[in-house]
A protein has these predicted regions:
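Structured catalytic core of nucleotide-sugar glycosyltransferases
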Residues: 1-121, 145-155, 164-173, 177-184, ...
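Short, well-ordered alpha-helical segments in soluble proteins
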Residues: 100-103, 128, 132
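Short, flexible active-site recognition loops that position polar ligands and cofactors
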Residues: 187-198
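Catalytic core of nucleotide-sugar-dependent glycosyltransferases
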Residues: 123-131, 197-207
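A recurrent flexible, glycine/aromatic-enriched loop bordering the glycosyltransferase active site
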Residues: 114-117, 130-142
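Short aromatic/basic micro-patch
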Residues: 143-144, 194
């Protein structure tokens, strides 16, 4: 597939330590869209230098709001596949090709599955999700979607679903979902969920 038909959406808030290398590592696979969620550091400058399209939020809209802006831009560019990718260095960029292959072979949504979780709340969320929807790791930030899923189901909700909503709605709507094991690296920077206590609260609230 023409790489201009693939968008890699990277939400970013104060990710100057990692964003340049993250963009560099994925841009061979498609158009890279960095959503700069009101960062106060040099995230925008470093993302642009690395070759990304940058969308700037004047006010922080959170992870779901950043995904909304990235998906809207990808759709505007005519991209047929949208891959979400975290900015903290955890995800293996070499796996993007596997996500694209699964979608080209008929899957509508591809969800990465981590081998272990750092928080009790993640275990609880995963257990509930697996029981209700058959999705092992809805909190994983590396997912792939066809543009058709986005066009039919619309944007992420205004409440903080931490990027889980579109995958779950896809299951409820009968879209074909594939899951793929991920190799996860240690975080280079802070977690997108925040500190330990706030992260657990945020994750459980999303249920």
């Amino acid at each position: 597939m023409d790489k201009h038909k693939v968008a890699i959406v990277i939400p970013a808030f104060n990710e100057e330590a990692t964003i340049y290398n993250q963009v560099q590592s994925v841009k061979e696979n498609g158009v890279v869209i960095v959503v700069n969620d009101a960062s106060t550091d040099y995230t925008e400058k470093k993302a642009l230098k690395a070759g990304a399209i940058v969308i700037n939020h004047k006010n922080n809209k959170g992870y779901d709001g950043a995904l909304n802006s990235g998906f809207f831009k990808a759709n505007e560019l005519g991209c047929e596949i949208i891959i979400t990718f975290d900015a903290d260095g955890q995800h293996d960029p070499s796996l993007i090709k596997n996500f694209i292959m699964l979608i080209n072979n008929g899957s509508d949504v591809v969800i990465g599955v981590r081998s272990n979780f750092q928080r009790v709340s993640e275990h609880i969320f995963s257990w509930v999700s697996k029981f209700k929807w058959g999705i092992d790791d809805p909190l994983c930030g590396m997912k792939g979607y066809t543009s058709n899923v986005y066009k039919k189901l619309g944007h992420f909700s205004s409440y903080d679903s931490i990027g889980t909503e579109l995958a779950i709605f896809s299951y409820n709507s009968g879209f074909k979902i594939a899951q793929i094991p991920l190799k996860v690296h240690d975080r280079i920077d802070d977690s997108r969920f925040g500190g330990r206590v706030s992260a657990n609260v945020k994750i459980l609230r999303a249920l």
